Curated annotation (Swiss-Prot):
Record carries keyword Nucleus: yes
Record organism: Homo sapiens
Gene from which this protein is expressed: FBXO38
Record motif Nuclear export signal 1, residues: 194-201
Biased composition (Polar residues): 703-740, 849-861
Name the UniProt record assigns to this protein: F-box only protein 38
Regions that span the bilayer: none
Lineage: Eukaryota, Metazoa, Chordata, Craniata, Vertebrata
């Protein structure tokens, strides 16, 4: 206090300061308050702030001393129980503090960050003995709240009368269980809530006061840890993944002790190997006295020996108050619900059912079962649930009031539509969550959703996976139950349950289980709520137990009688898992062949193409849409040139003298790009037989050797040797008789065929006069002599290059096949592969003068076009090479290309196949939102969803399109890491919706985005909204701008609505006349750009939102709130910092601008749309993000 008094005297003596200011500064209002008022104020302040006031003045020091003398409840963490107490305490200072509080009874927040185990002489520290000494200095102390294991054990030992307040939860839990985390619980410990995570505990004794016991990753070290277990006041018992005794008999005292807790409400046992049938017998003995009668939550997960009767007895006993049941996969069976159905019970409060429940730790942990057993956990081998559609029908007949349904990995569920019956209407179901039920049929699911009257939320995870590529081509169904493969992959062989169980435990679930026996449905099982009649239920459950045992025998017998063909299928090398309609499936690869992903190889080829053929001033053209399979063009005689069953292939160098006349070509539409006909297979066999005969009449260079090329898998008629649609042809079109020695391997053959083998053979076989290659569309001269190619199989010219042709003038010209959008079509356009010439209709599709013209190749006719599938959308950025540019480049040999095969095909075919179209049609009058994660759906259709509000799609690889027929109020769209999403189509669908709501669209694309084209389409389109496009470049992702935009986009719309409705402000329109009136930038809008940096990452916003710039630049008003963390430096616009809390307040701020726009007669839209694009995934690699 000395320095303060000294400074005051100095100020008084200073003649430059006015006297009235000195008087105001010296006046101390706090000292005018009484001690009683100050003590009353201290009740609302944290203890740390109270202690700081002690040094401000003498009166405040007296008030603090008086307050501490009478205080009875002290919180060292100011109510924040999750934080640590203030640092800086030592044993002496903590003792001094508590001595000032002689009447303290309850001490909360004793959470020291670190405590020494013992004192060290001469060293000031904060230690356990020092804390105990300070606590013992408080004579009236009743309870202490702490989270320190050693401290609470010391309190129990030296101060047993002190209660442990609140919830004891240790903060250093981990798995594997740290050996230093130890706690010995004494008998009769005074504690009500005990949460232990990652602790070594000898035993759980008798604790009469204990109400809530939560044990996770707890190692019970004594051989009989539950010998004295008795907690009669227990309400919650949770035991998850604990390392206890392996002998099931040692859990008998645990279950009997739980039965003695008459008020037990929550029972959760995960990986507890109690004795099978134990719960049944304990319930039989205790239900009359109230054992397990008050349960409202039952959770059984990975309990090795649990039987259906154990679960059934618990459910029946607790029927009156039961709210939630989570059932482990081994108990997820039809028989359980058939027996409960026959009990004829009512569950008036039941709401939540989780089938196939697997604990999160087992799902997220990468440890195998052997690793968990090594750390002391029970040895559990978990199989997927085997409940069928019959059991699901019984579910709702038993639990008629169910609201929340979650199903995990039940591979025997097929038709949800069959879950509905006269007695099973699912009338109260609000939320359905399906995970990895891979056999569920999409159309049946859509019909099921339509019949649910109260459904509001749908969550789909790893559902409706796309079938592997190539299955439709060879007639396989890949687990869908349709076609030839159903006999090979159906659920008939259960002789490898061990493998299935291990994979299921490691979050890799297979579909190798036997269907349950239907005899469970015939149990005559009746149950009433009267105590005297419940013996009938016990007898019925005994019968159910016998039937279940018989079922087990049947399954075992079927496993031993597995057909021989199923056992003969032995994988050579399990490489990795691929997601198909049957969940995650193993892909079997022969060890002698390296199989590469077709898409990745095509990307490599396109990169190689750019390195070889891109000139310095080469331009690039972007295709607008690549959606549907184009038309496949084949010649009439060459329709069987494709190969279906891997014929023998020999490579020749086709060369012919003179020129030949052209043969007309016809186009045939190809619905599926990989279908094989019997005619093609016969042609393959015939071509293979004819090759050796024709070889006899050919002149071969002496130095050349004829090699036979073996191919990987099968190829289709237009995909025989090419996967990329943008491919190189090197042809001698001049008609010279002899090739130059340096170009004999490259320029004398059509590169679309491997050495000119099959197509050359088929060409001469069909029509010797035709000189048009059926695939690359290059004219090749007919040859009287054929020479085998010098190049080996590995040196085969790549077929993914730009076409290079020797022109008549000797120069090397080039053309590349391009994807050209159909002009003027707003819907899905059919993309066509055409040549690069600037003549005909092809030239009309080119925009501007940025595209160089390519040369004509011997004639102006249209060349055959290969189909472009939606799966090829990543090859849309392809350059066009002009004649003059290629003339400057030096001739080079084609790059080496690896053999390609799509590793996601079941037959390892080197084919390009379109994604299997799967359309999810939603029609529900109460549906609010749908969330999809890792689903194989390609199209989402909102047919009739009047209450739908949001759509979330994350990591849906093949999701491409959205169609909105009737969903007027849907306003939030979230598409994150959807690899093949057609952004243009989705945005067009959303913006064409009637402007009844403001809408926000969040996109995280995984491909490059042409921002200029996107902005042009949105701002120039017929969309009656004010539009805002935000480009966010933070990596890792920052959600600050995304979250904050929702707080102010509605404010802009509210201002517009106020002006239009009450101020007679003109409303803007976006009709066809308006589009014709404003054909150029800014298309009748006031477009501006805002840029900035948030948390070190730049953002850019392009918008025509009115009023926003003025509101951002305005000064804060009297309503400004500074308790909000954001300002313009950390987000785009912070209205609360400005005090702009409502539309009325904002209109006062921008009144001048409103008058100007009224005079200019510029209208505004009532609704706004915000499009938020996050660019952290555009390189194709998904960024880890906790927010999705």
């Amino acid at each position: 206090m000395g320095p303060r008094k000294k400074s005051v005297k100095t100020c008084i003596m200073n003649n430059e300061i006015p006297e009235e200011m000195t008087a105001d500064e010296t006046k101390d209002y706090m000292n005018q308050l009484s001690h009683e008022v100050l003590c009353h104020i201290f009740r609302y302040l944290p203890l740390q702030d109270i202690m700081c006031m002690e040094c401000l003045s003498r009166k405040l020091k007296e008030a603090v001393t008086l307050y501490l003398r009478v205080v009875r409840v002290v919180d060292l963490c100011a109510g924040r129980w999750w934080e640590y107490m203030p640092s800086g305490f030592t044993d002496a200072s903590f003792l001094t503090l508590l001595k000032k509080m002689p009447d303290v009874e309850q001490l909360y927040g004793l959470h020291p960050r670190y405590l020494e185990r013992r004192r060290v002489r001469g060293h000031e520290a904060f230690s356990i003995p020092g804390v105990l000494e300070a606590l013992q200095a408080c004579p009236n102390l009743v309870g202490v709240e702490t989270s320190h294991l050693e401290l609470v054990e010391s309190i129990w030992t030296y101060m047993p009368h002190v209660h442990i307040l609140g919830k004891f939860r240790n903060r250093n839990g981990a798995f594997p269980i740290p050996p230093e985390n130890k706690l010995k619980i004494p008998i009769g410990a005074k504690i009500q809530t005990l949460h232990l995570v990652g602790v070594n505990v000898p035993e759980i004794p008798c604790i009469p006061m204990l109400r809530h016991l939560y044990m996770k990753w707890v190692r019970l070290t004594k051989p009989q840890p539950f010998k004295d277990f008795l907690c009669i006041s227990l309400r919650t018992f949770v035991m998850r993944n604990c390392a206890g005794p392996t002998n099931s008999l040692k859990y008998v005292p645990l279950v009997t002790g739980l039965a003695s807790a008459r008020n037990l409400e929550h029972l959760e046992m995960v990986r507890v190997p109690f004795l099978g049938g134990l719960i049944q017998h304990v319930v039989e003995d205790s239900w009359r006295s109230g054992g397990f009668r008050n349960l409202h939550t039952i959770v059984l997960g990975a309990c090795k020996n649990a039987l259906e009767v154990d679960l059934g007895y618990l459910i029946i006993t607790a029927a009156r108050r039961l709210h939630e049941v989570r059932i482990q996969p081994s108990l997820t069976k039809d028989g359980v619900f058939s027996a409960l159905k026959m009990a004829e019970l009512e569950f008036p409060q039941f709401e939540t059912l989780h089938l196939g429940y697997v604990d999160e730790f087992l799902l997220q942990s990468r440890m195998a079962n052997a690793d968990l057993v090594k750390y002391g956990l029970a040895d559990v081998v978990e199989n997927p649930g085997i409940i069928t559609d019959i059991g699901m029908k019984a579910v709702n007949e038993v639990f008629s009031c169910i609201k929340y349904l979650a199903i995990y990995n039940c591979p025997h569920l097929h038709n949800p539509y069959n879950w509905i019956s006269d007695h099973s209407r699912w009338t109260r179901l609000v939320d359905i969550n399906l995970v990895r039920c891979h056999a569920l049929k999409l159309d049946s699911f859509g019909q099921f959703i339509e019949l649910l009257p109260s459904l509001e939320f749908i969550s789909l995870d790893q559902m409706f996976r796309e079938p592997p590529k190539g299955c439709a081509r060879v007639g396989l169904s890949a687990g869908t139950g349709i076609g030839v493969s159903s006999a090979l992959v159906s659920n008939q062989n259960s002789n490898n349950d061990d493998n299935n169980a291990q994979n299921n435990n490691a979050n890799i679930h297979d579909n190798n289980h036997h269907h349950p026996d239907d005899s469970d449905e015939e149990n005559d099982f009746r149950q009433d709520l009267q105590p005297g009649e419940q013996q009938f239920a016990a007898d019925a459950l005994n019968e159910m137990e016998d039937i279940v045992q018989e079922d087990g025998e049947v399954v075992a017998e079927s496993g031993n009688n597995t057909p021989a063909h199923s056992q003969a299928i032995i994988p050579v090398d399990v490489d990795e898992e691929q997601a198909g309609p049957s969940g995650l499936q193993r892909v079997v690869k022969p060890t002698s062949i390296t199989v590469h992903d077709s898409e990745s190889d095509d990307e490599e080829d396109s990169l190689e193409l750019q390195e070889v053929w891109i000139p310095k001033n080469g331009t690039r053209r972007y295709s607008e849409r690549e959606e549907k399979t184009g038309e496949s063009v084949q010649s009439r005689e060459l329709s069987v040139s494709g190969k279906g069953k891997t014929p023998l292939r020999k490579r020749y160098n086709s060369h012919q003298m003179g020129q030949s006349k052209q043969f007309p070509l016809e186009e045939s539409s190809c619905e599926k790009g990989c279908q094989v006909t019997s005619e093609q297979i016969k042609a393959d066999m015939k071509a293979a037989r004819d090759i050796p005969e024709k070889k006899k009449n050919k002149d071969v260079y002496p130095s050349c050797s004829s090699t036979t090329a073996s191919t990987v898998g099968n190829s289709s008629s237009h995909n025989t040797a090419s996967q990329s649609p943008d491919f190189v042809r090197t042809v001698n079109s001049g008609g010279s008789s002899e090739p130059s020695p340096t170009e004999v391997d490259v320029s004398r053959q059509c590169a679309c065929s491997p050495g000119g083998s099959e197509d050359s053979e088929a060409m001469e076989e069909g029509d010797a006069e035709s000189s048009v290659c059926p695939r690359c569309c290059c004219h090749r001269p007919q040859e009287s002599q054929r020479r085998t190619s010098r190049c080996s199989d590995e040196e085969r010219p790549s077929t993914s290059r730009a076409c290079v042709v020797n022109g008549p003038d000797g120069t090397r010209s080039a053309f590349s096949f391009r994807t050209l959008p159909q002009g003027g079509s707003s819907g899905p356009a059919h993309d066509e592969r055409t040549n690069g010439s600037g003549s005909g209709a092809t030239g009309e599709d080119r925009r501007g003068s940025s595209q160089p013209e390519s040369c004509d190749v011997q004639s102006n006719e249209d060349y055959p076009r290969r189909p472009l599938t939606r799966a090829r959308s990543r090859l849309s950025h392809v350059l066009l090479v002009s004649e003059s540019e290629v003339a400057k480049t030096k001739p080079r040999h084609a790059m080496k290309r690896k053999r390609t095969a799509d590793k996601s095909t079941s037959t390892s075919d080197p084919v390009i196949e379109d994604d299997h179209v799967q359309v999810l049609v939603l029609k529900s009058k109460n549906l609010v939102g749908v969330t999809m994660t890792n689903c194989g759906i390609t199209d989402l259709v909102l047919k009739d969803c009047p209450k739908m509000m949001f759509i979330h799609a994350t990591r849906c690889r093949v999701l491409k399109h959205l169609k909105v027929e009737n969903a007027p109020i849907v306003n939030r769209f979230d598409y994150a890491q959807c690899k093949k999403l057609n952004m243009d189509q989705v945005l067009d669908q959303i913006l064409r919706m009637p402007p009844e709501r403001n809408r926000i669209i969040y996109l995280r694309p995984m491909q490059q985005v042409d921002t200029l084209t996107l902005e042009q389409k949105l701002f120039s389109g017929p969309y009656p909204y004010h539009i805002c496009i935000i480009h966010e470049f933070s990596n890792p992702p920052n959600v600050r701008n995304k979250v904050r935009i929702r707080s102010w986009m509605d404010t802009i719309a509210n201002i517009n609505q106020e002006l239009i409705k009450y101020e007679f402000f003109p409303e803007a329109t976006r009709s066809e006349e308006d589009l014709k009136k404003y054909p150029k930038y800014p298309w009748g809008r006031e477009i501006y750009t805002l840029e900035g940096v948030v948390d070190g990452a730049p953002y850019s916003m392009i918008s025509d939102f009115p009023w926003l710039r003025s509101l951002r630049a305005a000064e804060p008003n009297s309503f400004a709130r500074y308790d909000f963390e954001d300002d313009e430096e950390s987000t785009i616009y912070a209205p609360r910092r400005k005090g702009q809390l409502s539309a009325d307040i904002c209109m006062e701020t921008i009144g001048e601008e409103i008058s100007e726009m009224r005079q200019m007669k510029k209208g505004v839209f009532q609704r706004v749309v915000a499009i938020f694009i996050h660019y952290c995934d555009v390189n194709g690699e998904p960024v880890e993000d906790d927010y999705i």
